[in-house]
Regions:
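Conserved active-site beta-strand element of glycosyltransferases/polysaccharide synthases
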Residues: 253-257, 263-266
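Residue-level signal for inorganic ion chemistry
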Residues: 7, 33, 93, 110-111, ...
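Hydrophobic helical membrane-anchoring modules
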Residues: 262-288
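Short aromatic/hydrophobic "clamp" motif used to bind/position activated sugar donors
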Residues: 107
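N-terminal glycine-rich phosphate-binding loop and ensuing alpha1 helix
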Residues: 1-58
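Conserved N-terminal catalytic core of the sugar/cofactor nucleotidyltransferase
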Residues: 34-104
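Conserved core of the sugar-phosphate nucleotidyltransferase
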Residues: 117-168, 172-179, 183-254, 288
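Short, conserved active-site loop motifs that form the nucleotide-linked donor/cofactor pocket
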Residues: 3, 74-77, 211
Length: 288
């Protein structure tokens, strides 16, 4: 079987806190996006790659130059435009494939910020969905206890009650002093005055039974995915992943269990973890 890879890479990664977008952060001698591409570029079943990039992306040319020097067969890499939302970028990446992709061809969509996809997980996904009419995605069952955060502010606490000295019955009551405008805004809640960005409270514990964490790649038939995204965008609904677009049109993508090591880079700390995972994989390969 053959498949096409679409990689949305137009994001700027505001949470990452770096001058470069996270997909171009250095990682173990390469960039994050090069690691994300590696399993696909090494797979003979990958017919081509469509990467959605920001119009003013100044970093891709250097990466593309290194990829062009790779030994062996490297599938064609097509540059597509990026969009405001992920769904727009994916749709532009699909459109850039043009007549290369047939209606029933498989398309895999993979995050540019997931550098730790293992070749084994990729092959497992391909084998599991090879004959499926719609497709599915790599995912992992939720293992942690899940908490829903409250949207309500923390209840006010009168911190003066425990420290104030009792007033005798003979002591006259003093008139209240006028409060400044700042004191009026924060009211009588010292915690809000001191901690305007207070941590949220727990509203409830969510039953994790049946809950899975969606990963990528997500694998769907070309025509079905294009149609689902077109209908979602036309309705003003912006799916956070491709599977959600399929859900909205009545499909039920398959959850294919993958490795929790297939992490997404969202902060600088994640780069440390990704480096450790890649090192461990390389060490395991050498010792086999």
């Amino acid at each position: 079987m053959r498949y096409w890879l679409v990689m949305p890479a137009a994001g700027v990664g505001r949470r990452f806190g770096n001058t470069k977008p996270k997909q171009y952060a250095p990682l173990q001698g390469r960039t994050v996006i090069e690691w994300a591409l590696a399993p696909f570029l090494a797979d003979p079943s990958c017919a081509g790659v469509s990467i959605s990039l920001a119009a003013d992306d100044p970093y891709w040319a250097e990466v593309a130059g290194r990829l062009a020097k790779l030994d062996g067969r490297v599938p064609e890499i097509i540059r597509a435009g990026g969009g405001v939302e992920r769904s727009h970028s994916v749709r532009k990446g699909l459109a850039a494939l043009g007549t290369r992709a047939a209606a029933e061809d498989w398309v895999l969509v993979h995050d540019a910020a997931r550098p730790c996809l293992s070749p084994n997980d990729l092959q497992h996904l391909l084998e599991r969905l090879r004959t499926h009419p719609v497709g599915g995605l790599l995912a992992t069952p939720a293992a942690d206890t899940l908490k829903r955060a409250s949207t309500e502010p923390e209840p006010s606490k009168d911190l003066t009650r425990s420290t104030a000295q009792p007033r005798s019955s003979a002591e006259p009551r003093r008139a209240a002093e006028p409060r400044s405008s700042a004191e009026t805004r924060t009211g009588d809640n010292p915690s809000l005055a001191s901690h305007p960005n207070a941590d949220p409270q727990v509203a409830q514990t969510v039953d994790r039974s049946g809950l899975w964490r969606a990963l990528t790649p997500q694998m769907f038939r070309y025509e079905i995915l294009c149609d689902a995204l077109d209908r979602s965008i036309a309705a003003g609904r912006m799916p956070t992943d491709e599977a959600q677009a399929l859900e909205w049109v009545g499909e039920h993508p398959v959850l294919v269990q993958g490795s929790a090591a297939n992490i997404k880079i969202t902060s600088a700390d994640d780069l440390v973890l990704a480096a450790a995972l890649l090192n461990a994989r390389e060490t395991a390969a050498v010792t086999r």
